[in-house]
Structures are given as C-alpha cells and as structure tokens.
Curated annotation (Swiss-Prot):
Keyword list, A-Z: Cell membrane, Hydrogen ion transport, Ion transport, Membrane, Transport
Note: This organism has both a Na(+)-translocating F1F0 ATP synthase and this H(+)-translocating A1A0 ATP synthase.
Keyword Protease annotated: no
Organism of origin: Methanosarcina mazei (strain ATCC BAA-159 / DSM 3647 / Goe1 / Go1 / JCM 11833 / OCM 88) (Methanosarcina frisia)
Name under which the protein is recorded: A-type ATP synthase subunit G
Lineage, top ranks: Archaea, Methanobacteriati, Methanobacteriota, Stenosarchaea group, Methanomicrobia
Amino acid sequence: MAECDDRPNLVERAVMKLGEPKNQARLLQVAWRISLLMMVIGFIIIIKTISPNFM
C-alpha cells in the first residue's frame, strides 16, 4: 500500500496557489479580458450577419 504523507499533492498545491489574493486578481483580469474579447467578436459576427458589406 502507498504511504500516507502530509505533503499536499500537485492538485492541492495548485488550488492553494490559486486561492492567494494576488493570483485571484490576475485570474479575474484574464477572465475579464477573455469575456470582453468574446463580446467584441460576437458583435462583429452580428454586424457581419446583418450587413455583409460592413467592414
């Protein structure tokens, strides 16, 4: 059987690292930029669908 040690495994360390406020702020910034980019792409698709000669 495998030994039980008190060291956190890779997943637990990654979750603890993401829980730090500095990393949460960076993650929020990246998520906000991705959502903004998706919104802009969606508007471009809508405009191109409504008016094919635009752009």
